[in-house]
Amino acid sequence: MKRSTLADRYCSIARSSSELMDAWSFVILRELFLANMRFDGLQAQTGMSPRSLTLRLADLAESGIIKRVAYQQSPARYEYRLTSKGKELWPVVIALKQWGDKWSGPWSDDQPPLTLHHKDHDHQLELGFICKTCGEPVDAHSTEGTMSPAMTAEREQTASDYQQAIRSKRQGGA
């Protein structure tokens, strides 16, 4: 399925993936969360070519995840700041970091590359999911999803279209 098609699906995972599913986007977000907001700093830390970085920054700005803010007039220079929409990606980025700490090592000094500390507390931070209603920890095994009627209808149509394509291919190939 094409990435542009994902943006049209009636699914929040598909739509958000169409905006973000690019490894470079997450590396840029990491840098912005680390307060590295200027083009030169982003290029230095990501290793991206100027053209690739420019394109990714434009995509993130078009999606409303970042905004470009002038910090110098002559010559014009900009920094890139997370919008409210972008700041709400923090738990997503940290969940990806924690997954990478566990599954993308081993690390040369037996420590993850970045540790987070809870400000004003004397401990490392580890992201977890807590139900806001009851306060209990939750995971994939303690939750279940309920699809909306619109999502159910789209999935049924997608399955039907797929089966029709298979039948057509078989009939044409016979």
Regions found by a protein language model. Give the residues of each.
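Canonical helix-turn-helix DNA-binding module
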Residues: F39, Q43-Y71, P75
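C-terminal regulatory/oligomerization modules of transcriptional regulators
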Residues: D101-A174
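Short aromatic/hydrophobic contact patches that present stacked aromatics
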Residues: Q45, E79-R81, T115
